[in-house]
Amino acid sequence: MRSNFVSLHPYFKIHPGKLEAVKAAFPCFVEKTATEKDNLFYGFSVNGDEIFCREAYESAEGVLAHLDNIGALLAEMLTMANLVRVELHGPWKSSTN
């Protein structure tokens, strides 16, 4: 079983009236993320006015590269939704320790 990847889980609360605009942005995020070599999986879930993004990367460096890659898209998303929580999960020790 593989357990040395790093996963990122941001949660957003959508501003009133912005649900369709937020959902329309999802393909842009997915397309941009598809170019990242360290990405393992990536996707969005919507529950009412809340968004959850489930994503994972080969390493912490992959997470940082992803954040650089989607920075402009994320800035736009934050005009339509508030970031309410972020979870980052990874191995206890790096594979080189």
Predicted regions and their residues:
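Short S/T/G/P-rich N-terminal loop/turn motif that feeds into the first structured element of a domain
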Residues: 1-52, 58-68, 79-97
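Long, charge-enriched, surface-exposed interaction segments in small proteins/subunits
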Residues: 71-72
